[in-house]
Amino acid sequence: MNQSLGPSEPEKPQDNTAEDSTEPTPDNHRADLSELRGIPKKQTGIEGFEDISHGGLPLGRTTLVSGTSGTGKTLFAMQFLYNGIVKYQEPGIFVTFEETPADIIRNASSFGWDLQALIDRGQLFILDASPDPEGYEVSGNFDLSALIERIQYAIRKYKAKRVSIDSVTAIFQQYDPAGVVRRELFRLTARLKQANVTTVMTTERTDEYGPIARYGVEEFVSDNVVILRNILEGEKRRRTIEILKLRGTTHMKGEYPFTITNDGINIFPLGAMQLTQRSSNVRVSSGIEKLDEMCGGGFFKDSIILATGATGTGKTSLVSKFLERGCLDGERCILFAYEESRAQLSRNASSWGIDLEEFERQGLLKIICAYPESAGLEDHLQKIKTEMMAFKPSRMAIDSLSALARGVSQNAFRQFVIGVTGLAKQEEITGFFTNTTDQFMGSHSITESHISTITDTIILLQYVEIRGEMARALNVFKMRGSWHDKGIREYLISNAGIQIRDSFRGYERIISGSPTRINVDEKNELSRIVQNVQALEEEGL
C-alpha cells in the first residue's frame, strides 16, 4: 500500500482495545427495532439530496453509493466530505483504493475545492490504500485488520465525523473469495458504526438496471443504498439518482434527474415540490389589448401560459409582445430561445416594432440562446435555474418547448417542464412558453407529452381555410380561475404585430379544420348578444 496523505501519517496502534478485539456478529450489528424509529440524519450539503432523502443520510451508518463508470460516485463521496468540512465544520477521512491522493486533489480543484488547504488545517485526511504500481502478491488468509486499525486511528486523531471509501470494488478485484471479502467488509462497517461516523462507500455495477453491485454482496453489508445512473436516451445521456433503501427511515421513491455543474452534483427533486406557493389575483398584460380582454383583464401574475400552434402562426410574436409589455412597465424579463439566434430574434421583433436590443441595453431584458442538442435536459434546466436566480425576472419565456422535446423521452421532457414551471411559480414569475405542433391544419393534440395539465392558460393558434383563402384563428382554450372569451377570433400579423379581430361569424367547425358556413338569423343573433351583455353586467364583469 502507498503512503497516506495528511499532516502526518497516523501510526498503526501497538495495542488493541477490548472493543476492537470483539468480532462483530450480525446480531449485535443490527439495531433494536425501537432504535430504528426517528433516526437522526446528517445533511450531505448536496443540493436536492436532503429533499429526496427526507433530511440526509442516517447518522452513524454506512451508505453504499453504486453506479456504472462515470456516474459520479467518487464525486458524491468527496462532496459529502467537503460539504461536511466547509458547511458543517465536521472533519472527514477519505479512503481511496483506486486513485492516488494527488489525483484526487487535482480532480477536486476543478470544482473549486482546495483539498490541500483542508489537509494542511487537519480537517481532511486522505488514506491511500491504492495498489502499489510495482505489484505485490498476497499469501495466507486475507483480512482488513490493518486497514481497519488505520481508519480507526485516523478517526480518533482527526475527530472525524464523516468517512468516504472509494471504492470497495477494488478490494474484490484484488482478493478472493467473495465470501471472505464480504466478511471483512462487514467487520469494517461494524467498526465504523462503533466509531459513530457516517460513511459513504462506493461500488461499481456493470449495468444501469442490473444487479446493485458487481459482486452481488456489497449491498448486504450496508444499511443504505443509493444508485447513480447515466442512461443513454436517444442520442443524449441522462443522469438520475435513486435511493433504493434507507434502513429504518423514510425517503422518496423513484429516480430523480441530476446534473454535474461547477459546484458538484445538483439534484432536481421534482417529486418533492410542494403546491404551497401563493396564488396572486394581480393581472399582467399580454401586450395585446384584445387578448387581455379575451382573458378577462390579462394573465394572472404567477401563471404559466402556453401558446401552441403550427409553425408560422405567430407564437414568437406573442412572446415578443409579452416581453415588450413587461419591459415597458419596468419589469425584468428573460427569454430562453432554442430555435433562433439573438440576431434573428432582434430582426424579427424589429419588424413588429419591438426593439429587443434597446431593452437589453437598459438591463431590462436578457436573452439566452442555445441549440437544444447542445446539452441534456437536466443541463438546460440547471442553466435556466441559474440564470433566473441571478437575473431575478418578473417575466420569463421559453421559445420553444417542442425544440427541447426532440430526441428525449416523454417522461424526461415532462419532468423538465415540471421543473421549470415549479421554479417559476415558486419565484412568482409569469411564464410564457411556446409549443410547435406537427399538424399544419385541423384538430390536433395540444401537446404530445400531455404537459397541458401543468399550464394555467392555453392559447390555441391555428390555420383555417375560408373561401379559398388562408386565415389564422386564435382561441383561449383554457384559463384557470378566470372567465375568458370562448370565441374563435381571426387575427392578422402585421408590422404592428398580432392584431386580433372579431370571431368568425357564420362558420362552425373552425377548430376541426373543416369550417362550414351556416345561416345566421341576424335578429336572433343580435338578441342573443344583448342578453349576454346584460348577463355580464349583472354579474359585475
Curated annotation (Swiss-Prot):
Record PTM Phosphothreonine, positions in chain: 453
List of residues binding Mg(2+) 2: 316, 339
InterPro entries cross-referenced by the UniProt entry: Circadian_clock_KaiC-rel, Circadian_KaiC_bact, KaiC, KaiC-like_dom, KaiC_C, KaiC_dom, KaiC_N, P-loop_NTPase
Binding site for Mg(2+) 1: 74
EC code(s) of this entry: 2.7.11.1, 3.6.4.-
Keyword check for Metal-binding: yes
Single Gene Ontology BP annotation: regulation of DNA-templated transcription
Residues bound to ATP 2: 311-316, 352, 472, 478-480, 482, 484, 486
Cofactor(s) this protein requires: Mg(2+)
Basic and acidic residues compositional bias, start-end: 26-35
Region (Disordered): 1-40
Regulation: The interaction with KaiA enhances its phosphorylation status, while the interaction with KaiB decreases it.
SUPFAM superfamilies, per the entry: P-loop containing nucleoside triphosphate hydrolases (SSF52540)
UniProt keyword annotation of Protease present: no
Posttranslational mods: Phosphorylated on serine and threonine residues by autocatalysis. Has a 4 step phosphorylation cycle; the autokinase acts first on Thr-453, then Ser-452. When Ser-452 is modified KaiC switches to an autophosphatase mode, acting first on phospho-Thr-453 then phospho-Ser-452.
Secretion signal, residue range per the UniProt entry: none
Any Pfam family: ATPase
Reaction catalysis annotation: L-seryl-[protein] + ATP = O-phospho-L-seryl-[protein] + ADP + H(+); L-threonyl-[protein] + ATP = O-phospho-L-threonyl-[protein] + ADP + H(+); ATP + H2O = ADP + phosphate + H(+)
Binding sites annotated in the UniProt record for ATP 1: 70-75, 110, 245-247, 249, 251, 261
Cofactor note: Binds 2 Mg(2+) ions per subunit, one in each domain. Mg(2+) is required for hexamerization and phosphatase activity.
Domain free text: In the homohexamer the 2 domains (called CI and CII) self-associate to each form a 'donut' layer; the compactness and local conformation of the domains varies over the cell cycle and impacts function. CII has the autokinase and autophosphatase activities, both CI and CII have (weak) ATPase activity; CI has the clock pacemaker role.
Summary of the function given for this chain in its UniProt record: Central component of the KaiABC oscillator complex, which constitutes the main circadian regulator in cyanobacteria. Complex composition changes during the circadian cycle to control KaiC phosphorylation. KaiA stimulates KaiC autophosphorylation, while KaiB sequesters KaiA, leading to KaiC autodephosphorylation. Clock output pathways impact the RpaA transcriptional regulator. KaiC enhances the autophosphorylation activity of SasA, which then transfers its phosphate group to RpaA to activate it. KaiB and KaiC together enhance the phospho-RpaA dephosphatase activity of CikA.
UniProt family annotation: Belongs to the KaiC family.
NCBIfam families: circ_KaiC, PRK09302.1
Record note on quaternary structure: Homohexamer; hexamerization is dependent on ATP-binding. The KaiABC complex composition changes during the circadian cycle to control KaiC phosphorylation. Complexes KaiC(6), KaiA(2-4):KaiC(6), KaiB(6):KaiC(6) and KaiC(6):KaiB(6):KaiA(12) are among the most important forms, many form cooperatively. KaiC interacts with SasA, activating its autokinase function and leading to RpaA activation.
Protein name (record): Circadian clock oscillator protein KaiC
